[in-house]
From Swiss-Prot:
Keyword Acetylation set for record: no
Lineage, opening ranks: Bacteria, Pseudomonadati, Pseudomonadota, Gammaproteobacteria, Oceanospirillales
InterPro entries according to UniProt: Ribosomal_bL20, RIBOSOMAL_L20_CS, Ribosomal_protein_bL20_C
GO cellular component term, pick one: ribosome
Entry protein name: Large ribosomal subunit protein bL20
Family matches, as Gene3D superfamilies: 6.10.160.10, Ribosomal protein L20
Entry-linked HAMAP family: Ribosomal_bL20
Species the sequence originates in: Hahella chejuensis (strain KCTC 2396)
Keywords: Ribonucleoprotein, Ribosomal protein, RNA-binding, rRNA-binding
Length: 118
């Protein structure tokens, strides 16, 4: 049985990991052992934060909607309750955009919610 030398495969594997670790600080971008750990940890952070991003954006939208709603004399929870009663199906992303960039349109939506609550 011939002897297997791993020079080519090892170099390829090391190169792949070190390329993934480009831009990391110090040994994390130069030393294979350290770089491998850094790349694994980066992957864990990326996996976790892809899920957290969804939560963080929803929280941001809610904060923006709440600020816009309070400018129009209504709290966030009352606004959402009013929109549900009025059967207005605008998601929070769009509501937040209206609250930030289209104040008049958002005021009309708030008015619709107020009418449904009254």
């Amino acid at each position: 049985m011939p002897r297997v030398k791993r020079g080519v495969t090892a170099r390829r594997r090391h190169k792949k990991v070190l390329n993934q670790a480009k831009g990391y600080y110090g040994a994390r971008s130069r030393v294979f052992r350290v770089a491998k750990q850094a790349v694994i940890k980066a992957g864990q952070y990326a996996y976790r934060d892809r899920r957290q991003r969804k939560r963080q954006f929803r929280a941001l939208w809610i904060a923006r909607i709440n600020a816009g709603a309070r400018d129009n004399g209504l709290s966030y929870s009352r606004l959402i309750a009013g929109l549900k009663r009025a059967n207005v199906e605008i998601d929070r992303k769009v509501l937040a955009d209206l609250a930030m960039n289209e104040k008049a349109a958002f005021a009309a939506v708030v008015q619709k919610a107020k009418e449904a609550l009254a």
